């Protein structure tokens, strides 16, 4: 049951975009259309889930036994960069239109602080391997949920009468803030 709690917490209560403000760049940059938001969400989910598992193994099989903890951040960034390259090659071959739509934001997953943040928090919270995977997948699903909801709202705002001073980025920031407040409501949720 604790695995479900870890996942639900990562999706709703500790959403990395809306409560920890990690991954804001792709959240704001790729959320203009639902289709591209879903594509980015799937790519981040794949990278974050694999990065969580691989960084756990690297931390406890290599870095800790060899007392190389000071290389943790560099090692994790290299792992994430390699995974992003893999995802980029897969998307380029399987969906050229999605690859084109994601544009510069796909390589930016390498520097997406949410992916690195999840890997580091998994180690900091001393999760075991299974808990690490559940937290990584939950965090990725939370990112995907947030970016897809935000993209849906932004699509609707494009056809709405928005005051001139709030058109574009200002209304996007206000909307993101309101979403963060809405997700804050989950923090009082009692599970079990």
UniProtKB/Swiss-Prot annotation:
GO terms for cellular component: plasma membrane. This is Na(+)-translocating ferredoxin:NAD(+) oxidoreductase complex subunit A. Keywords: Cell membrane, Electron transport, Membrane, NAD, Translocase, Transmembrane, Transmembrane helix, Transport. Belongs to the NqrDE/RnfAE family. The keyword NAD applies. It is a multi-pass membrane protein. InterPro entries: Ion_transpt_RnfA/RsxA, NqrDE/RnfAE, NqrDE/RnfAE_oxidrdctase. Its EC number is 7.2.1.2. It catalyses: 2 reduced [2Fe-2S]-[ferredoxin] + Na(+)(in) + NAD(+) + H(+) = 2 oxidized [2Fe-2S]-[ferredoxin] + Na(+)(out) + NADH. PANTHER family: INTEGRAL MEMBRANE PROTEIN OF SOXR-REDUCING COMPLEX, ION-TRANSLOCATING OXIDOREDUCTASE COMPLEX SUBUNIT A. The chain crosses the membrane at residues 4-24, 38-58, 71-91, 101-121, 133-153, 169-189. The complex is composed of six subunits: RnfA, RnfB, RnfC, RnfD, RnfE and RnfG.
């Amino acid at each position: 049951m604790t695995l479900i709690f870890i996942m639900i917490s990562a999706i709703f209560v500790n959403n990395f975009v809306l409560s920890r403000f990690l991954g804001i760049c792709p959240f704001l940059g790729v959320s203009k259309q639902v289709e591209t938001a879903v594509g980015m969400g799937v790519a981040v989910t794949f990278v974050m889930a694999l990065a969580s598992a691989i960084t756990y193994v690297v931390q406890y099989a290599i870095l800790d036994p060899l007392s190389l903890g000071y290389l943790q951040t560099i090692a994790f960034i290299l792992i994430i960069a390699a995974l992003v390259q893999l995802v980029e090659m897969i998307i380029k071959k399987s969906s050229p239109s999605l690859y084109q739509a994601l544009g510069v934001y796909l390589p930016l997953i390498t520097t997406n602080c949410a992916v690195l943040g999840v890997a580091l928090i998994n180690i900091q919270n001393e999760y075991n391997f299974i808990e690490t995977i559940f937290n990584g997948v939950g965090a990725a699903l939370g990112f995907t949920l947030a970016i897809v909801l935000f993209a849906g709202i932004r699509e609707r705002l494009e056809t709405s009468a928005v005051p001139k001073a709030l058109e574009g980025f200002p209304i996007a920031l206000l909307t993101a803030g309101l979403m963060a407040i809405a997700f804050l409501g989950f923090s009082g949720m009692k599970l079990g």
